[in-house]
Amino acid sequence: MRTRHLVGLISGVLILSVLLPVGLSIWLAHQQVETSFIEELDTYSSRVAIRANKVATQGKDALQELERWQGAACSEAHLMEMRRVSYSYRYIQEVAYIDNNVPQCSSLEHESPPDTFPEPGKISKDGYRVWLTSHNDLGIIRYMVAMGTAHYVVMIDPASFIDVIPYSSWQIDAAIIGNAHNVVITSSDEIAQGIITRLQKTPGEHIENNGIIYDILPLPEMNISIITWASTKMLQKGWHRQVFIWLPLGLVIGLLAAMFVLRILRRIQSPHHRLQDAIENRDICVHYQPIVSLANGKIVGAEALARWPQTDGSWLSPDSFIPLAQQTGLSEPLTLLIIRSVFEDMGDWLRQHPQQHISINLESPVLTSEKIPQLLRDMINHYQVNPRQIALELTEREFADPKTSAPIISRYREAGHEIYLDDFGTGYSSLSYLQDLDVDILKIDKSFVDALEYKNVTPHIIEMAKTLKLKMVAEGIETSKQEEWLRQHGVHYGQGWLYSKALPKEDFLRWAEQHL
């Protein structure tokens, strides 16, 4: 993946690393409050169901105890027994004795009005009859839950079924409805119209209506359902509390993640990784600076110079990134890339012009490489060019240790490559050991060409090269005066802006065709 794409990806990850923990913390706060809200609603429904079962069980126990009583119906002793049972069982409001569903007496009155009980709304599995009735001996219009056997009926206040403290962080209301006709038996607050029907259509699901969340718990054995609800306003308050807990944690995690991603981003944007990426993606290309004969101005070859295009349209020269490649162990892959590019660009041209050559620079770190000689052999065979057409340029640094460099240079020369000594004269020992170097061509550094008029060393270099029968290439020729001086002093070849700057492949080929 290209560095710029990777940088874009990691920049996106950086943004996510900050926003995601914060967003996640807000989401978790909301989820925790909502989960807690629903759990408390469900828990309250279950507690109301337990209470309803407890009340119903107490009613059954009271009826069983009344059925065991023996004596004259509606006598003082009988009335006292019914009053005792009504008093003893806390949820029982009244006890009535009936005969053929007609009340005869109750714990409140010696004689009851002869109002016949209707058919029960529900008969439980264990035979108890259940009504929702407003019948009582006091004449008060108030619905009560009646449970009965053949001879007794106990009246239970419906509010007893939902008389449960929520123990929650917010107000929860509850209602009990009769399943037969959806009649509200009791409710702690008014319930919205239509909610009962909607809840019965989606059992087990929660419904939100006008900022209120409803839950239903059917109790088919009692023919009732429990509905609980609470306002979401309290949910929002709880959410704000949780945000203050989760948000700082999310910010801390986000900042730590951002610091980690920034370290990765800085590393990827480092010069080392940028150069490595450029090599792997073949972003580094080769330009070619013509080398001409000073005798007739015709081209004899070119020096291959690496160029690294930048995103702003500029180019980096080798002086900018070759030292970096040497420091970071990228010299070998960079050199291999340049060699491949030279043959891909110039292989056909060299085959068509066997008198031309391309010189390639080799740096110290790659002299011992086994991959470079092998690649040169493979490319030469593939493009069918003469090894002499690929010259290798080495600086005097590469010759600093003759014991190491001599066998390597000898191997390249035996393979047919001419060896250029580049930047000659810039080091402290160059003149002293020139005669011991096994090279073919001496390149006179641009600094000596620039100072022809006031440096005496240049003529000495030229004379030494002549003595050793070395051909010479002068670099950095920019004026006709320099060209004339060099030609008069016997320098064979030259390169510089007087002739052409380093050119991309297509431009170079056009220039070369005009100067053959």
Curated annotation (Swiss-Prot):
This is Probable cyclic di-GMP phosphodiesterase PdeB. One of its GO terms (molecular function) is cyclic-guanylate-specific phosphodiesterase activity. SUPFAM superfamilies: EAL domain-like (SSF141868). Induction: Expressed during transition into stationary phase, at both 28 and 37 degrees Celsius. Expression is RpoS dependent. Phosphodiesterase (PDE) that catalyzes the hydrolysis of cyclic-di-GMP (c-di-GMP) to 5'-pGpG. The keyword Membrane applies. Its EC number is 3.1.4.52. Its main location: membrane.
